[in-house]
Regions:
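Basic polycationic patches enriched in arginine
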Residues: 6-12
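Short hydrophobic alpha-helical segments that form membrane-spanning helices or hydrophobic packing faces
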Residues: 179-186, 303
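Short helix-capping/hinge SLiMs at alpha-helix to coil transitions
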Residues: 188-189, 292-297, 310-314
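Short, positively charged loop/turn segments that connect secondary-structure elements
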Residues: 279-280, 309-324
Length: 324
């Protein structure tokens, strides 16, 4: 199965470096993250701009607070507005409106293959006002700022600042693997996404070196702390750069994992269809055998059919369904 998936990935263009690997969304996401940081201490204006984004495209603002009034918001939840289970058309519309309202210069992307998305029912990175601590959203903003600084300038001071805020946020309500998705959205070449698809892919020695797989397996059994997350992120890049894989960075890795999982899902759907078809056949296997026994072991199809109807006490409706 894995070898089939690898052929599927190569067929889609990994070895030839076609446009599928250009990831136009990265420029937009990175620029928007940088722009969002300017609202860290002016969240009231940010909330008004979010309302404008939705008004501009005649859509309702999603539920972001227990009441009707949004009193605060964090930057990862803002990214979650267009990285959750919505249609591609709505996603493009929201991003297009964001580009206008926030004056983003990067091209508005229209392809989002391989980008991890949130569950619509868990689309905020904070608990609603009665279920969160006073500094929860402030902490997320501090992590957001530290993550951008660390991604743009990897030194010991920025690494330590990132680790401090990551560990603080990791223990907050509504934070689980989604925090790694958020980090990936804002700086996809710097942070590895550890959603279920990537964890599955990274844990297979067909996709990554055995020593890497062994070193991270226990670390991804639960949401890692900062030390473990940084270990995984650094070890992954080292493994990718030192081996002959089609993927050389986190976006390519995530895209490969997405393609592989889609192939597996297609295989499961096909198998499910075959099982369903087999079950329909097996429904009549025993009655056919019994009918043949009853008529002495040899009979025309019409005689066997008549005997099955008699033995199974089939109604007119069932008989007609059988004909169809």
């Amino acid at each position: 199965m894995i070898h089939k998936m690898r052929r599927f990935v190569r067929w889609r263009g990994f070895e030839k470096g076609v446009t599928l690997m250009q990831f136009e969304w990265i420029d937009f996401y990175s620029e928007f993250a940088t722009k969002l940081l300017t609202f860290k201490n002016n969240r009231g204006e940010l909330i008004e701009k979010i309302k404008e984004v939705y008004a501009d495209i005649h859509m309702n603002v999603p539920k972001l607070e227990s009441g009707d009034v949004i009193i605060d918001i964090d930057p990862f939840t803002v990214f979650g507005l267009f990285n959750k289970g919505i249609t591609n058309a709505n996603r493009v519309a929201i991003i297009g409106s964001i580009a206008r309202v926030f004056d983003i210069q990067a091209k508005v992307p229209d392809n989002f293959d391989g980008i991890p998305v949130l569950n619509n029912l868990k689309a905020t990175f904070y608990g609603f006002k009665d279920g969160r601590k006073m500094d929860d959203i402030d902490n997320i903003w501090n992590l957001f700022e530290a993550a951008i600084n660390f991604a743009d300038n990897d030194d010991e001071e920025n690494r330590a600042e990132f680790a401090k805020w990551y560990d603080k946020v990791r223990d907050q309500r509504c934070i689980r693997w989604n925090i790694t998705m958020g980090l990936y959205w804002i700086r996809p070449f710097a942070y590895i996404n550890l959603d279920s698809r990537n964890r599955w892919y990274l844990s297979n020695v067909e996709n990554m070196p055995a020593e890497f797989v062994d070193s991270i397996k226990k670390k991804i059994n639960k949401v890692p702390n900062a030390a473990d997350y940084l270990f995984i992120k650094d070890a992954c890049i080292k493994a990718l750069s030192g081996n002959n894989y089609e993927y050389k960075n986190y976006p390519e890795l995530s895209y490969s994992a997405w393609l592989a999982s889609e192939q597996v899902n297609q295989g499961k759907e096909t198998a499910r269809g075959k099982r369903k078809s087999s079950a329909a056949f097996l429904r009549w296997f025993r009655p056919i055998i019994q009918a043949l026994r009853d008529v002495g072991g040899s009979a025309s199809p019409m005689e066997v059919r008549a005997k099955i109807i008699e033995n199974e006490h089939l109604s007119e409706e069932e008989i007609n369904a059988t004909r169809g």
